[in-house]
Swiss-Prot record:
Superkingdom of source: Bacteria
Binding-site positions, substrate: 428-429
EC number, as in UniProt: 1.3.7.7
HAMAP family per UniProt: ChlB_BchB (MF_00353)
Pfam families xrefs: Oxidored_nitro, PCP_red
Cysteine pairings via disulfide bonds: none
Segments forming a coiled coil: none
The protein's annotated pathway: Porphyrin-containing compound metabolism; bacteriochlorophyll biosynthesis (light-independent)
Cofactor stoichiometry and binding remark: Binds 1 [4Fe-4S] cluster per heterodimer. The cluster is bound at the heterodimer interface by residues from both subunits.
Swiss-Prot/TrEMBL cofactor(s): [4Fe-4S] cluster
Protein name per its UniProtKB record: Light-independent protochlorophyllide reductase subunit B
Length: 535
């Protein structure tokens, strides 16, 4: 029944294909019923690349099952002939798991050389997107990475960057720019853009950088245990975390440099990290102290997402913008303990750990924060509630897979996040000004009928900010919910409240009225509630 609703994480196939679709010369064969190739449409729609997804379906049909035959060997032969991949990853589906088919045996009968096949036999019922992706990347690194000499100059591997990653290309560009400024080259980016030969030379780097808790951490751990490679797992999101990240890179690179007999690197002047090479690398420190941003110290924020971005954004909002964090949560059950440790002292209550978007929506409706930082699901929920929302992590939509340069990492990323926070909270004020001062002839009608005013709502829901009626009976919006009615005079007073807090004011006023034993919200009740609630 859960599949009838939105899910924060995709299936195991989604995670597997994110890894293989990122790589060069790697193809996925999914042994599944017809129709499970829907995933190719996701990449074609969202991924801004000229290449077609490297995914084929070995169709499981009832007739074949009745005859005791399988199409998998034939499909593997066709893929080898048509695409000539360096490696074909064979992935099971829920159907093949139920049938208990032996994919290793079927693959062995295909005639394709064993070294060009990898059967990733996970349990598709228990493993979801990120765990499947992280596990497959680990298997690939374990299989192909080989010991070798270090590069003569300082170099790093960037691990965990995958197809459909959040602001993927911009984040990579930001990291490359900062590393180049330090005098550090990039040995391999994996899995994004990497081939099998690139995986072989991973141990040549001096340092692994795996900024995502969800994907890449396991592979970095293996490289550390097997080849003695140090790693950095922190994400450089925000000005202070970026400075700490740069210091960590310098420290670990210089530690390896002592062994290699290479002169140490140092921290350059900060303006060297700016886009023009002359100004401050980020405008956040001074922007946070402007009169405009000082008002944000009273704004309340709620953050929900994956482990990496939830931790980073909570710290950025409180430490660098001075906002109040009223709550945070994650849908990553596997990493909930990590999030709790990182956010100790940042949250007044318990961390919300759930993969049900309805639970998150309920918290937002109860708290009515000034800003929500979440996923595409929270954006939908907030639109219904007229709560400002910005997307900080997957699941996302097309507006988070951009051609332009909008990183979240580094000094540039801090500016992008600050801009989005500011605009998410501030945009929409013109709607309130029209509500408050009148339309000034901007194609709005003062005396619109209820049936005419409903379509004017920005989100497809009836908007109490629309035109008032001449009738004395309360409108549907006035009695929506538990039957509390409002007089026309009280409704008119409510319309003078900014739209982005109007639902919160309505809810608080009705709660006050119930406590006073009132069944109807009048103008007097509204004024009393305002005084009582400190408005």
């Amino acid at each position: 029944m859960r599949l009838a609703f939105w899910l924060y994480e995709g299936t195991a196939l989604h995670g597997i294909s994110r890894i293989t679709n990122s790589m060069k010369g790697v193809h996925t064969v999914y042994h599944a019923p017809q129709g499970d190739d829907y995933i190719t449409a996701t990449y074609s729609m969202l991924e801004r690349t000229p290449d077609f997804p490297g995914l084929s379906i070995s169709v499981v049909r009832g007739r074949d099952l009745a005859q005791g035959v399988s199409r998998l060997p034939g499909t593997l032969q066709q893929v080898a002939h048509h695409y000539s991949p360096d490696l074909t990853v064979i992935a099971p589906s829920c159907s093949t798991a139920l049938l208990q088919e032996d994919l290793h045996q079927l693959a062995a009968h295909s005639g394709v050389p064993e070294e060009k096949l990898l059967v990733y036999a996970l349990n598709p019922f228990r493993v979801s997107e990120n765990e499947a992706a992280d596990g497959l990347f680990f298997e690939l690194v374990k299989r192909f990475a080989v010991a070798q000499e270090k590069t003569p100059r300082p170099s790093v591997n960037l691990l965990g960057f995958t197809s459909l990653g959040f602001h993927l290309r911009a984040n990579l560009t930001s990291l490359r720019r900062m590393l180049q400024t330090l005098g550090v080259s990039v040995n391999v980016v994996a899995p994004w853009g990497a081939g099998i030969e690139d995986l072989r030379k991973l141990p040549a780097a001096w340092l692994n950088i795996a900024p995502y808790r969800e994907i890449g951490e396991t592979a970095a751990g293996y490289l550390g245990e097997t080849f003695g490679m140090p790693a950095i797992h922190e994400a450089p999101i925000g000005v202070e975390p970026t400075l700490a990240w740069l210091r960590s890179v310098i420290e670990k690179i210089n530690a390896v440099g002592v062994e290699q007999g290479v002169p140490p690197i140092g921290m350059p002047k900060l303006n060297a990290f700016s886009l023009d090479g002359m100004s401050a690398p980020s405008g956040v420190p001074w922007f946070a102290r402007t009169a405009d941003m000082e008002s944000f110290s009273n704004k309340r924020a709620f953050v929900f997402g994956d482990a990496t971005h939830t931790v980073s954004i909570v710290k950025f909002l409180r430490d660098e913008l001075g906002m109040k964090i009223i709550g945070a949560g994650t849908y990553m059950h596997r990493h909930a303990d990590f999030v709790r440790r990182e956010l100790e002292g940042y949250l007044s209550g318990e961390l919300l750990v759930t993969d049900k978007f309805q639970d998150v929506s309920k918290v937002i409706e109860d708290e009515m924060p000034d800003l929500v930082c979440g996923t595409q699901m929270e954006r939908h929920s907030c639109r219904k509630l007229d709560v400002p929302c910005m997307v900080i992590c997957p699941p996302t939509h097309i507006e988070n897979h951009l051609l332009g340069y909008y990183p979240f990492f580094g000094f540039d990323g801090a500016d992008v996040i600050a801009d989005r926070v500011y605009l998410s909270c501030k945009l929409g004020l013109e709607k309130h000004l029209i509500d408050f001062f009148g339309d000034a002839g901007l194609e709005y009608e003062d005396e619109a009928s209820p049936s005419e005013s409903a379509p004017h709502a920005s989100n497809g829901h009836e908007d109490v900010a629309g035109g008032s009626t001449a009738q004395s009976v309360p409108s549907h919006a006035a009695t929506e919910g538990d039957g509390m009615s409002w007089t026309d005079e009280a409704e008119n007073m409510l319309k003078k409240v900014p739209f982005f807090v109007r639902k919160k004011v309505r809810k608080n006023t009705e709660n006050f009225a119930r406590e006073q034993g009132e069944t109807t919200v009048t103008a007097d009740v509204f004024r009393q509630a305002k005084e009582s609630l400190g408005g």
